[in-house]
């Protein structure tokens, strides 16, 4: 698991906290206005027709609220949610056990759905399309297929890598929603709401400062608030002020744009060793000692979002904005 402070991936200590902070309705949910408004319409229409909601695929970077939205969908539909993940479903029998335990209308939430094995996907296809399950009983010549009817249900899949889903699986989702990075104002509102739940006083400017450095991600904003709260209690009077916030984030090595030592290592590695690029992903991986898929899925998305890095056919290139951030001159071609 990635223990990095600025990782959007969920850490062990985040789980209970996120559950306590999780909004229960779309009205309470901050941000993701486009996805939220569309879901409001689809949910209301399904309820008016007394049908289950179409299967929903939520995709986007980690930490943006996919699990929260899955739970909200179940709450808005007035049904239960059953949660599992792609890696947890190892055999067709595991999936069959989950599907046959569902009640009519229930939401089945599969996190990291792109990690489902293809043999599992094939069992899922008839379940999604026809609400039935084909089970093979026995082996060899005496084997026979038995079809079980399933109650109507809604599958909500979440993934950080929509492109890794097979086309047949992706095409079976009726609703596809991409979750975007949050604005500073949205994150500031989330930080203030979290501080209220924590019963911690926070200045509005301090909330904005945390939001600016949270990489557009609510999970990171809440994690930073927890760490800043520690400094406020030990080094201050318990109130999260602008002064305490700036001091804490500096000591935590989170700069004004939300970059940490790993981001600096990646960008400066390309600048200093490869004159800013282009350089291939595998070479970057060997240079900074991180696995290529971790660089691609965890570190690069935010650097691409803020325009510090470009992916080109010839490799990664550091942009003039990154040079400016480090106070360096871009080499002349």
UniProtKB/Swiss-Prot annotation:
Cellular compartments annotated: Cytoplasm
CDD domains (UniProt xref): AAA
Keyword DNA repair in annotation: yes
Record keywords: ATP-binding, Cytoplasm, DNA damage, DNA recombination, DNA repair, DNA-binding, Hydrolase, Nucleotide-binding
InterPro entries reported for this sequence: AAA+_ATPase, AAA_lid_4, DNA_helicase_Holl-junc_RuvB, P-loop_NTPase, RuvB-like_N, RuvB_C, WH-like_DNA-bd_sf, WH_DNA-bd_sf
Region (Small ATPAse domain (RuvB-S)), start-end ranges: 183-253
Binding-site residues for ATP, renumbered to this chain: 21-22, 63, 66-68, 129-131, 172, 182, 219
Positions contributing to Mg(2+) binding: 67
Any GO CC annotation of this UniProt entry: Holliday junction resolvase complex
Gene3D superfamilies in the cross-refs: 1.10.8.60, P-loop containing nucleotide triphosphate hydrolases (3.40.50.300), Winged helix-like DNA-binding domain superfamily/Winged helix DNA-binding domain (1.10.10.10)
Residues the record lists as binding DNA: 311, 316
Annotated spans, Large ATPase domain (RuvB-L): 1-182
GO molecular function: ATP binding; ATP hydrolysis activity; four-way junction DNA binding; four-way junction helicase activity
Region (Head domain (RuvB-H)): 256-333
Enzyme Commission code: 3.6.4.-
A Pfam family matched in the record: AAA_lid_4
Subunit comment: Homohexamer. Forms an RuvA(8)-RuvB(12)-Holliday junction (HJ) complex. HJ DNA is sandwiched between 2 RuvA tetramers; dsDNA enters through RuvA and exits via RuvB. An RuvB hexamer assembles on each DNA strand where it exits the tetramer. Each RuvB hexamer is contacted by two RuvA subunits (via domain III) on 2 adjacent RuvB subunits; this complex drives branch migration. In the full resolvosome a probable DNA-RuvA(4)-RuvB(12)-RuvC(2) complex forms which resolves the HJ.
Cited function: The RuvA-RuvB-RuvC complex processes Holliday junction (HJ) DNA during genetic recombination and DNA repair, while the RuvA-RuvB complex plays an important role in the rescue of blocked DNA replication forks via replication fork reversal (RFR). RuvA specifically binds to HJ cruciform DNA, conferring on it an open structure. The RuvB hexamer acts as an ATP-dependent pump, pulling dsDNA into and through the RuvAB complex. RuvB forms 2 homohexamers on either side of HJ DNA bound by 1 or 2 RuvA tetramers; 4 subunits per hexamer contact DNA at a time.
Family label: Belongs to the RuvB family.
NCBIfam families documented for this protein: PRK00080.1 (NF000868), ruvB (TIGR00635)
HAMAP family per record: DNA_HJ_migration_RuvB
Domains: entry comment: Has 3 domains, the large (RuvB-L) and small ATPase (RuvB-S) domains and the C-terminal head (RuvB-H) domain. The head domain binds DNA, while the ATPase domains jointly bind ATP, ADP or are empty depending on the state of the subunit in the translocation cycle. During a single DNA translocation step the structure of each domain remains the same, but their relative positions change.
Name recorded for this polypeptide: Holliday junction branch migration complex subunit RuvB
Organism: Bacillus anthracis
Organism phylogeny: Bacteria, Bacillati, Bacillota, Bacilli, Bacillales
């Amino acid at each position: 698991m990635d223990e990095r402070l600025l990782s959007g991936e969920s850490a062990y200590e985040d789980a209970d906290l996120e559950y306590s902070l999780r909004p229960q309705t779309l009205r309470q949910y901050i941000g993701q206005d486009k996805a939220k408004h569309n879901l409001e319409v689809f949910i209301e229409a399904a309820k008016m027709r007394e049908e289950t909601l179409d299967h929903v695929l939520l995709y986007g970077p980690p930490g943006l609220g996919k699990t929260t939205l899955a739970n909200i969908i179940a709450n808005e539909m007035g049904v239960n949610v059953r949660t599992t993940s792609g890696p947890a479903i190892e055999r067709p029998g595991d999936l069959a056990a989950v599907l046959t335990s569902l009640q009519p209308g229930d939401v089945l939430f599969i996190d990291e759905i792109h990690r489902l094995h293809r043999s599992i996907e094939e069992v899922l296809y008839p379940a999604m399309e026809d609400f039935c399950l084909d089970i093979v009983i026995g082996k060899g010549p005496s084997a026979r297929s038995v079809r079980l009817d399933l109650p109507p249900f809604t599958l909500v899949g979440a993934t950080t890598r929509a492109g890794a889903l097979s086309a047949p699986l992706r095409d079976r989702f009726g609703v596809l929603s991409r979750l975007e990075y949050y604005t500073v104002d949205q994150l500031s509102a989330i930080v203030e709401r979290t501080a209220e739940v924590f019963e911690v006083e926070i200045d509005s400017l301090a909330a904005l400062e945390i939001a600016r450095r949270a990489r557009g991600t609510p999970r990171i904003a809440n994690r930073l608030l927890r760490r800043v709260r520690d400094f406020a209690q030990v080094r201050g009077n318990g109130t999260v002020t602008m002064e305490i916030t700036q001091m804490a984030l500096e000591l935590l090595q989170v700069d004004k744009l939300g970059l940490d030592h790993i981001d600096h290592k990646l960008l400066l590695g390309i600048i200093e060793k490869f004159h800013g690029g282009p350089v291939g992903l595998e070479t970057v991986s060997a240079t900074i000692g991180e696995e290529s898929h971790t660089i691609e899925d965890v570190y690069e998305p935010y650097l691409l979002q803020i325009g510090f890095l470009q992916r080109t056919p010839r490799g990664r290139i550091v942009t003039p904005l990154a040079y400016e951030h480090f106070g360096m001159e871009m080499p002349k071609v």
